[in-house]
């Protein structure tokens, strides 16, 4: 009888432990709670925004998808109105400063005293040094603009070649 109780106890313990493992595995997406996403040739960016008494908070992840490693990363975010006038800006230096390919780093900025209105935009600017193999590092700048409320990318208009 005691042998049967031991077997049932071990079985119950294994079932409960495996359920914990499956539950933890299901929660491993680092961008699950970040509703806005942008993908470019060099970085993937995922973020969320929320208002506090200090202003507009932007928190997210920056993932290197192109280079063997990037370093000296500066991420700047600008709040623009519909006429592209800068209403607020902030910069951060994501840590760690060296991001290997397929690794990501968290970032956070506060656009102080910012209260976005309908039609406002966020412009993300990523300044970094990229290194591919043994060729040394090159400085790059990557940027994109999105609607503040939806995260939908706004393509910048390209002027006709005859316009100067």
Annotate the PLM regions.
Residues 17-36:
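Bacterial Sec signal peptide processing site at the extreme N-terminus
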Residues 89-140:
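Short, solvent-exposed, Trp/other aromatic-anchored flexible loops in extracytoplasmic proteins
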């Amino acid at each position: 009888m005691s042998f049967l109780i031991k077997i049932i106890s071990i079985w119950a313990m294994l079932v409960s432990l495996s359920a914990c493992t499956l539950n933890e595995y299901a929660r491993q997406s680092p961008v699950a709670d970040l509703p806005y996403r942008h993908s470019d040739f060099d970085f993937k960016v995922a973020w969320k925004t929320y208002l506090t008494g200090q202003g507009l908070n932007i928190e997210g992840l920056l993932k290197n998808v192109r280079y063997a490693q990037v370093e000296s990363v500066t991420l700047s975010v600008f709040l623009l109105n519909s006429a592209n006038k800068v209403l607020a800006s902030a910069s951060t230096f994501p840590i760690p400063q060296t991001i290997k390919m397929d690794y990501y780093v968290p970032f956070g900025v506060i656009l102080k005293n910012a209260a976005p209105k309908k039609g406002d935009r966020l412009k993300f600017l990523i300044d970094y040094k990229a290194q591919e193999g043994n060729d040394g590092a090159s400085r790059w700048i990557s940027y994109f603009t999105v609607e503040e409320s939806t995260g939908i990318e706004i393509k910048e208009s390209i002027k006709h070649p005859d316009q100067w």
